[in-house]
């Protein structure tokens, strides 16, 4: 089948920002001006096209990244709308993995906020070229130039200003295009669909000339011929200038910065032009690397329809009409509905049922997809987030995404008998959609425990169970996911024998437990030489230890940052078995760990509080009382920003305390930073609580 749009006219982009910077409204306007959305949906009245889950419309924040396709100047723009709330950074990470470029949206009043920094760092990790859109220029306190300074100070980026605002706050009238050196004024009567190029107002001429010079000086560095001509006093023409800006943006030398007000319908079209002119197509980004499953050889798959098929599943969503939808980015080759592909991570064949092109909440069925496409596939049985789908004859595994460990857990109990079965199914579905959400059952109490990235994260998942799956459940108080580790090296010898007539059990093990640096997790190695423990019994030792580390010796929390080395052992020709070695390893763990200096670890959160000066003393005092360690204070506009490291255990309900302390004027964000040792007095309290 022939492609409708050539690959160099594709743009796979994400819109990323802090909560409330106006990301969903911006996406809405893009869909409106590209002819994909006929009525402008406002987040203000809970009707945005991209926010299609009920809770999103109610809370006015975006939770799931809906993928949608729009067309602009004969280019096909696939947009992934990403959530800006810190509890959903996993969604952002997931969508950045499959994008070629991104638009960072900033609030012109607040500037670069904490979550913007987090997302920016994630985009750096995946080497995603990006541009910035300074939004909400019509708000009181809007300051475009301060925002540009913050992009330098906070993000360490090189901003390249492409257009300047004309006026600000209620006087915001339009922008000055520094490439064309014209002013752009929008018509308000047709919701900003049309605009005029006019001469730059006299009072802005000097500012425009200054920024035009900065633009030229930075951009021409990307092209030797343009640079030489510029040094001789010849300015590049519009096309050459755009080429230079594009080259530098894709090479991540600088980030183009534009401004506008999506809500007031100003500045969106120049931003779309910039997406097409400056952000990369699938052909401009490096080809994807993968491994051949059997040989683990490195292989490169270029972005072309002629290469073998490969795609990455980056999101699973449950749709009320068609069931489970798998969103996938096709990196190479083509695929047709009805064909078979290989899930190389699970080693299972999957049949591609129907394929859909999504537009926020309506869809178009397609029969064929090629390299560069982002599609939703119906009917995949075994595929979860992060899996690779590939050609059955030439399989490949693309690099997997890494997902953070959950830091908070709550117990959930179904309210009625009928809810028991439904809850199991609902939780399984939600866990398949979201890899940072885990479900476990507590072996002692028999309760179902759900784990996630924050209070809001779990609250929304419980809410979805109620709405989508009609499951009523009661939720316990949030619990902290503590861990245990050891502080010194200890070797334990253990003999397990059981003789009671008939065949007995015998296993002898010598295991060294040694501490590892923070964040290393648990490791097992066998140092057996000379067959003191036969090869076939070593998996038994590994299995026994693996099951034992889930329950530490201090208060029954999982053990981490520890290495267990099997150094010696003994066996009996008749009585030894894998099971005997499993039991011996478990007992060795129980005996050895208390002597290896066990310690309790707790999750430490990085907290940033933005508060008016008047409440600063109260906020700092309160953070100190929560065992917080103040990292520093900054001035942001007329507010103070306090950075601190605080144990998660002391942060429950903080939002209400902060609200009442500052009369609702202070805000905070927090995300997991690291695990740290619990002080002795607190450790004793936790032990007593667990024992009681």
UniProtKB/Swiss-Prot annotation:
It is found in: Cytoplasm. Keywords: Cytoplasm, Elongation factor, GTP-binding, Nucleotide-binding, Protein biosynthesis. Its main location: cytoplasm. One of its GO terms (molecular function) is translation elongation factor activity. Gene3D superfamilies: 3.30.230.10, 3.30.70.240, Elongation Factor G (Translational Gtpase), domain 3, P-loop containing nucleotide triphosphate hydrolases, Translation factors. One of its GO terms (biological process) is ribosome disassembly. It comes from the Bacteria. SUPFAM superfamilies: EF-G C-terminal domain-like, P-loop containing nucleoside triphosphate hydrolases, Ribosomal protein S5 domain 2-like, Translation proteins. This is Elongation factor G. PANTHER family: RIBOSOME-RELEASING FACTOR 2, MITOCHONDRIAL (PTHR43261:SF1), TRANSLATION ELONGATION FACTOR G-RELATED (PTHR43261). GTP binds at residues 17-24, 81-85, 135-138. Catalyzes the GTP-dependent ribosomal translocation step during translation elongation. During this step, the ribosome changes from the pre-translocational (PRE) to the post-translocational (POST) state as the newly formed A-site-bound peptidyl-tRNA and P-site-bound deacylated tRNA move to the P and E sites, respectively. Catalyzes the coordinated movement of the two tRNA molecules, the mRNA and conformational changes in the ribosome. One of its GO terms (cellular component) is cytoplasm. Residues 8-283 form the tr-type G domain. The lineage of its organism: Bacteria, Pseudomonadati, Pseudomonadota, Alphaproteobacteria, Rhodospirillales. Belongs to the TRAFAC class translation factor GTPase superfamily. Classic translation factor GTPase family. EF-G/EF-2 subfamily. InterPro entries: EF-G-like_DII, EFG_II, EFG_III, EFG_III/V, EFG_IV, EFG_V, EFG_V-like, G_TR_CS. SMART domains: EFG_C, EFG_IV.
């Amino acid at each position: 089948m022939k492609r409708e749009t050539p690959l160099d006219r594709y743009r796979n982009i994400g819109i990323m920002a802090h909560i409330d910077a106006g990301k969903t409204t911006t996406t809405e306007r893009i869909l409106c001006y590209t002819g994909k959305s006929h009525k402008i949906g406002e987040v203000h009245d809970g009707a945005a096209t991209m926010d299609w889950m009920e809770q999103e419309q109610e809370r006015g924040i975006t939770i799931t990244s809906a993928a949608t396709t729009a067309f602009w100047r004969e280019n096909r723009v696939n947009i992934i709308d990403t959530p800006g709330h810190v509890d959903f950074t996993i969604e952002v990470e997931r969508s950045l993995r499959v994008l070629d470029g991104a638009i960072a949206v900033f609030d012109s009043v607040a500037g670069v906020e904490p979550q913007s920094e987090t997302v920016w760092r994630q985009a750096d990790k995946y080497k995603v070229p990006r541009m910035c859109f300074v939004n909400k220029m019509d708000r009181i306190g809007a300051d475009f130039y301060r925002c540009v300074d913050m992009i330098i100070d906070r993000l360490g980026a090189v901003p390249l200003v492409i257009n300047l605002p004309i006026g600000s706050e209620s006087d915001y009238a339009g922008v000055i295009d520094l490439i064309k050196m014209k002013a752009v004024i929008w018509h308000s009567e047709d919701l900003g669909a049309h605009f005029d190029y006019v001469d730059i107002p006299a009072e802005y001429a000097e500012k425009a000339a200054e920024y035009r010079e900065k633009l030229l000086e930075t951009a021409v560095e990307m092209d030797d011929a343009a640079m030489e001509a510029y040094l001789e006093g010849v300015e590049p023409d519009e096309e050459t200038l755009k080429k230079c800006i594009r080259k530098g943006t894709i090479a991540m030398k600088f980030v183009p910065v534009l401004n506008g007000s999506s809500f007031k319908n100003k500045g969106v079209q120049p931003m779309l032009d910039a997406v097409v002119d400056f952000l990369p197509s699938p052909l401009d980004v490096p080809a994807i690397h993968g491994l051949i499953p059997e040989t683990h050889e490195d292989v490169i798959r270029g972005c072309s329809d002629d290469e073998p098929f490969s795609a990455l599943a980056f999101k699973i969503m449950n749709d009320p009409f068609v069931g489970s939808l798998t969103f996938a980015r096709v990196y190479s080759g083509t695929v047709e509905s009805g064909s078979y592909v290989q899930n190389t991570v699970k080693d299972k064949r999957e049949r591609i049922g129907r394929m859909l092109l999504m537009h926020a909440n309506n869809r178009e069925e397609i029969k064929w997809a090629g390299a560069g496409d982002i599609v939703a596939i119906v009917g995949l049985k075994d595929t979860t987030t992060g899996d690779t789908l590939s050609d059955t004859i030439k399989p490949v595994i693309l690099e997997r995404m890494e997902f953070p460990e959950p830091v908070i857990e709550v117990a959930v109990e179904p309210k009625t008998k009928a809810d028991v079965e439904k809850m199991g199914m609902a939780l399984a579905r939600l866990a398949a959609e979201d890899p940072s959400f885990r479900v476990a059952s507590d072996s002692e109490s028999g309760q179902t425990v759900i784990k996630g990235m924050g209070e809001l994260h779990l609250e929304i998942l419980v809410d979805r169970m109620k709405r989508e799956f009609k499951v009523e459940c009661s939720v316990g108080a949030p619990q902290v996911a503590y861990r245990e580790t050891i502080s010194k090296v200890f070797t334990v010898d253990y003999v397990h024998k059981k003789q009671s007539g008939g065949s007995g059990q015998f296993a002898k093990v010598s295991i060294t437990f040694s501490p590892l640096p923070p964040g290393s997790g648990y490791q097992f190695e066998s140092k057996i030489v000379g067959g003191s423990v036969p090869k076939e019994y070593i998996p038994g030792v590994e299995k026994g230890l693996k099951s034992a580390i889930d329950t530490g010796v201090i208060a029954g929390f999982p053990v981490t940052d520890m290495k267990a080395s099997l150094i010696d052992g003994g066996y009996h020709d008749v009585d030894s078995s894998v099971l005997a070695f499993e039991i011996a390893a478990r007992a060795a763990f129980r005996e050895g760990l208390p002597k290896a200096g066990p310690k309790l670890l707790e999750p430490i959160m990085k907290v940033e509080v933005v508060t008016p000066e008047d409440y600063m003393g109260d906020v700092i005092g309160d953070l100190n009382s929560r065992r917080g360690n103040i990292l520093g204070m900054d001035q942001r506009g007329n507010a103070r920003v306090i950075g601190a490291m605080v144990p998660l255990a002391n942060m429950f309900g903080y939002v209400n305390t902060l609200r009442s302390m500052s009369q609702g004027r202070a805000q905070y964000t927090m995300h997991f930073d690291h695990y740290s040792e619990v002080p002795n007095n607190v450790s004793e309290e936790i032990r007593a609580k667990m024992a009681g």
